[in-house]
Regions:
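Long, contiguous binding/interaction regions
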Residues: 1-62, 67-180
Length: 180
């Protein structure tokens, strides 16, 4: 039997979640980051990664880079709500520009002895990770790259004696001569 046409009947859709990197240019003043985070937490949106820094070329402005997931409609809603905030100057969905560069840095501490030590160094070389601290019992590696490369490196270090990881979060910038 067909459903009656009604303003109250909403066809259920199951759009897949997508991951998007948003770059948000804001006034660098107290409370702005808390307001942006409040927008996400108040509506139940998840933040996968968050980085914030004052921009070099425009003083008193900061760039917030947020990696978030949601359906296309949720992502659109997040961008619209960010755009309406008073201290926000611009919101760019780096995922949609198609020509952006994303990088992350991680420091990875691994216990290292015997064969595990040799294997950890071999993997670090393969991933172009640098040794930034070494003792007879452990290493600290520094690795940069996209998030999946860093996650893969961490996964390979687990069986070798992974102790701890500190990740910076994603930084993103568009390619070419134009700015944000």
């Amino acid at each position: 039997m067909n459903q009656p046409a009604s303003a109250y009947f909403i066809e259920e859709r199951h759009d897949p979640n997508e991951t998007h990197t948003l770059s948000v240019l804001v006034q660098n003043e107290p409370g702005v980051l808390a307001r942006v985070i409040g927008l996400f937490s108040g509506r139940g949106y998840n933040i996968e990664s968050l980085t914030v820094s004052e921009t070099e070329n425009q003083k008193h402005l900061s760039r917030i880079t947020i990696v978030t997931t949601g359906t296309p409609m949720v992502i659109q809603q997040i961008k619209h709500q960010l755009d309406r905030m008073i201290p926000v100057y611009r919101v760019v969905d780096m995922t949609l520009t198609g020509s952006s560069i994303e990088r992350e840095l991680a420091m990875v501490k691994v216990r290292g002895g015997g064969d595990h030590r040799v294997e950890a160094l071999r993997l670090a070389d393969a991933f172009r990770a640098r040794v930034i601290d070494a003792t007879t019992e452990s290493f600290v590696f520094e690795i940069t790259g996209n998030s999946s490369k860093i996650s893969q490196f961490i996964d390979l270090m687990r069986p070798l004696g992974l102790v701890e990881v500190s990740r910076t979060g994603v930084a993103a910038i568009t390619r070419g001569p134009e700015g944000m």
